[in-house]
Amino acid sequence: MVKLGNNFAEKGTKQPLLEDGFDTIPLMTPLDVNQLQFPPPDKVVVKTKTEYEPDRKKGKARPPKIAEFTVSITEGVTERFKVSVLVLFALAFLTCVVFLVVYKVYKYDRACPDGFVLKNTQCIPEGLESYYTEQDSSAREKFYTVINHYNVAKQSITRSVSPWMSVLSEEKLSEQETEAAEKSA
């Protein structure tokens, strides 16, 4: 461990080590300026273009120059068009963000009132929860389940005659249908 609170001014004087378990090594030592600067080089060599030209005269093969091919989509386009495109992209991005927020609010932030349970993103009464759990998740099977449930309910209820249609008129209609079937046969 290092004992804090050493005086850096007393660098030259050595203190005897104390027997308390701490070293008296200073945490920071001053830097010498000579360590930071490198001596300047004796000779500086600067290569110029004239030094490379003799290589061409000697017949050495140089790689062929390849023409640069750059395509700029903004060349010849006005600043007004660039700003318009930037604004359109910003509006498209903001529209996507708004739709995402609306979707999340619609899809996940559903709270049902008392006495209702959230089942398949719909609030249903607690009494009908067992009916909805019997249904399968596919839409076609849900459709057939509802139809079968309607047929069972229709059979359990006694057939009632509408007040505007009497039993006699039903019998007349059935007789007319049978006569029409006999004539066509």
Swiss-Prot record:
Entry membrane topology: Single-pass type II membrane protein
Main subcellular location: membrane
Tissue: Pituitary and less in adrenal gland and testis. Expressed in the hippocampus throughout development. At P0, highly and broadly expressed throughout the cortical plate, but is down-regulated overall at P8 and P14, but remains relatively enriched in layer V. At P0 is expressed ubiquitously in the developing cerebellum namely Purkinje neurons as well as granule neurons. However, it becomes restricted to Purkinje cells by P8. This exclusive expression in Purkinje cells is maintained throughout adulthood.
Region (Required for GRIP1 interaction): 129-164
Endoplasmic reticulum among keywords: yes
Localisation per UniProt entry: Membrane; Golgi apparatus, trans-Golgi network membrane; Endosome membrane; Cell projection, Dendrite
Leader peptide range in chain numbering: none
Subunit organization: Forms a complex with GRIP1, GRIA2 and STX12 through direct interaction with GRIP1; controls the intracellular fate of AMPAR and the endosomal sorting of the GRIA2 subunit toward recycling and membrane targeting. Interacts with STX12. Interacts with APP; could regulate APP processing. Interacts with FAM171A1.
Functional summary from the UniProt entry: Plays a role in the recycling mechanism in neurons of multiple receptors, including AMPAR, APP and L1CAM and acts at the level of early endosomes to promote sorting of receptors toward a recycling pathway. Regulates sorting and recycling of GRIA2 through interaction with GRIP1 and then contributes to the regulation of synaptic transmission and plasticity by affecting the recycling and targeting of AMPA receptors to the synapse. Is required for faithful sorting of L1CAM to axons by facilitating trafficking from somatodendritic early endosome or the recycling endosome.
Record's protein name: Neuronal vesicle trafficking-associated protein 1
Naturally occurring in which organism (per UniProt): Mus musculus
